[in-house]
């Protein structure tokens, strides 16, 4: 697929470059010409920066295959996220971006986001309600991003309430099936025995990869599961419907899928800051703040360093770009000239709510400008 980022930058470069040519032909050089040139450069960079931010908003929605920003209910956003280890690790040790120059060239980057981890919260199973006459946990709906042959890990996380004394807990995960002739409605998925000590409750993970893959291959077989965790006295310790003081302790599925990194080539370019007087093509810093957009459906990062390219590309320096140089030599009036664009970009990792109110952890390619050049 063609790289949208390249076309956006080339278009912006051509559009913005018109500004310096719109001067009055009768204007005369003055002693302030150098100062005016610096002001023009600042205005140019400001226009480029604003256009870059708008382009980023469009690219994120496009790369996540979203027609518009998800309309997530305020109640869901205010609801505490699961307090389990895998999600806390993603948030606490969040790798917003990598400045590793060995990864992520523009040419080798795929366009759409690659999903790495999906956190799926449970819903009530209509089939269970119909059978039992009351809501039961749990039923999981799955994103179309998950393909059965790409699943490398699937863990069901459940929270077990605290115990008052050393206790053996018997955990059983049952899969709901269509009633059989003998009345059987469940089949076992996993059973395990745990020794719990007094104190706070604990999170327990259970491997459900095989079950998930079967559900993905045969969606009609996904009717829900039931979670049981009884102590020696028959007390149910599993939090399935959180009570008072149990916010964020819902069971959930953590699914990890494959993501194959790609090799890239090295390139070099200029780095500048906003006070730089450099006129040549250069990379400038730019921080994108999602909260300023009102994009509260993005959990993390709330902001990231995107950077942008700005500056002049003189033909005298184009020995590195023979094709562009030949075009200009053949038709100097009809050639728009080279444009200062990204020559290397890297991805960002993002934790966000999708349109189905699932929490997705994925990698969005080509969102950070690492190097700029003329092309």
Swiss-Prot record:
Entry protein name: Growth/differentiation factor 8
GO-annotated cellular components: extracellular space
Subunit structure: Homodimer; disulfide-linked.
Cross-referenced Gene3D superfamilies: 2.60.120.970, Cystine-knot cytokines (2.10.90.10)
Residues that carry a glycan: 71
Cellular localisation: Secreted
Organism this protein belongs to: Columba livia (Rock dove)
Single Gene Ontology BP annotation: negative regulation of satellite cell differentiation
Positions of disulphide bridges: 272-282, 281-340, 309-372, 313-374
């Amino acid at each position: 697929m063609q790289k949208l980022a390249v076309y956006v930058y080339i278009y912006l470069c051509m559009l913005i470059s018109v500004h310096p040519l719109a001067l009055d032909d009768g204007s005369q050089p003055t002693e302030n010409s150098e100062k005016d040139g610096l002001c023009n450069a600042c205005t140019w960079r400001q226009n480029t920066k604003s256009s870059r931010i708008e382009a980023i908003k469009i690219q994120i929605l496009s790369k996540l295959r979203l027609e518009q920003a998800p309309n997530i209910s305020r109640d869901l956003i205010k609801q505490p996220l699961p307090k389990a280890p895998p999600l806390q690790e993603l948030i606490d040790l969040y790798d917003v971006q990598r400045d590793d120059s060995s990864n992520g060239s523009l040419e080798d980057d795929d366009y759409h986001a690659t999903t790495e981890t999906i956190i799926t919260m449970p819903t009530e199973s209509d089939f269970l309600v119909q059978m039992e006459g009351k809501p039961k946990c749990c039923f999981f709906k799955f994103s179309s991003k998950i393909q059965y042959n790409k699943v490398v890990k699937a863990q069901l996380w459940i929270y077990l309430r605290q115990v008052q004394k050393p206790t053996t807990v018997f955990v059983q995960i049952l899969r709901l099936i269509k009633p059989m002739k003998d009345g059987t409605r469940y089949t076992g998925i996993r059973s395990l025995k745990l020794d719990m000590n007094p104190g706070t409750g604990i999170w327990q993970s259970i491997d459900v990869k095989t079950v998930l893959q079967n559900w993905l291959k045969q969606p009609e077989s996904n009717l829900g599961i039931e979670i049981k965790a009884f102590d020696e006295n028959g007390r149910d310790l599993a939090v399935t419907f959180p009570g008072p003081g149990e916010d964020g302790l819902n069971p959930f599925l953590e699914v990890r899928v494959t993501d194959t990194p790609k090799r890239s080539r090295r390139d070099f370019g200029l780095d500048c800051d906003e006070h730089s007087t450099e006129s040549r093509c250069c990379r400038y810093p730019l921080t994108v703040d999602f909260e300023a957009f009102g994009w509260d459906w993005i959990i993390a990062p709330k902001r990231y360093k995107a950077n942008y390219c700005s500056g002049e590309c003189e033909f005298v320096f184009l020995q590195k770009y023979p094709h562009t140089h030949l075009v200009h030599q053949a038709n100097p009036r009809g050639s728009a000239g080279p444009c200062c664009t990204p020559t290397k970009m890297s991805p960002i990792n993002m934790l966000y709510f999708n349109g189905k109110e699932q929490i997705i952890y994925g990698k969005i390619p080509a969102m950070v400008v690492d190097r700029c050049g003329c092309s």
